[in-house]
């Protein structure tokens, strides 16, 4: 469900329509990259303490929060919320980085890992394709706000599903 990012084809446009300049957009992307760079090791230590499943749930909580913040930032045209969204999304990425693969390896072992990783990757690709194709229809019906709302709803579903991950 994380592949369902309905605003992805127009990520720059989402922010510029809310008053963010292209220059600031790229600074926000740099902030996101910086948070990921700085957060990889600390979140890895946290994952070692709390386990893969809980880290993946935290990642979903944070990603849902980031998408909700993006919607709020767009509606309110708030640069501060765009900044917070970039930080929260960066932390979410840190919690997912490598954790999904490690979770699958721990769950299925060497024999089942490759097939399950390919299966998970295929779902991500399918989600990306579905959201890219659906983008035009959603945009025509409900505009940019509709794209963001649909993404938040998809992330809410992913968040709910994360609680059903096996231990």
Which ranges hold each PLM region?
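Cytoplasmic membrane-interface "Motif A"-like loop-to-helix N-cap segments
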Residues: 49-60
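Helix-loop boundary and gating motifs at the non-cytosolic
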Residues: 1-38
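C-terminal ends and interior cores of transmembrane alpha-helices
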Residues: 61-77
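Residue-level signature of mid-helix packing/kink "hotspots" within the transmembrane helices
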Residues: 33-41, 128-133
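Symmetry-related core transmembrane helices of the 12-TM Major Facilitator Superfamily/SLC fold
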Residues: 146-164
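Transmembrane alpha-helix termini and helix-breaking/packing motifs in multi-pass membrane transporters
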Residues: 128-151
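Paired small-residue
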Residues: 80-88
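Cytoplasmic helix-loop-helix junction between adjacent transmembrane helices
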Residues: 87-124
């Amino acid at each position: 469900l994380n592949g369902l990012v309905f605003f992805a084809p127009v990520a720059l446009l989402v922010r510029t329509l809310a008053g963010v300049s292209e220059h600031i957009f790229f600074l926000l992307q740099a902030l996101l990259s910086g948070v990921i760079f700085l957060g990889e090791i600390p979140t890895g230590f946290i994952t070692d303490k709390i386990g893969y499943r809980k880290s993946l749930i935290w990642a979903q909580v944070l990603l849902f929060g980031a998408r909700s913040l993006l919607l709020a930032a767009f509606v309110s045209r708030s640069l501060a919320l765009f900044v917070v969204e970039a930080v929260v999304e960066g932390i979410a990425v840190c919690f997912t980085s490598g954790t999904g693969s490690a979770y699958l390896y721990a769950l299925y072992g060497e024999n089942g890992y490759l097939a399950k990783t390919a299966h998970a990757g295929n779902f991500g690709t399918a989600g990306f394709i579905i959201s890219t194709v659906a983008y035009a229809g959603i945009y025509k019906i409900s505009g940019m706000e509709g794209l963001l709302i649909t993404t938040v709803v998809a992330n809410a579903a992913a968040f709910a599903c994360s609680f059903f991950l096996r231990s």
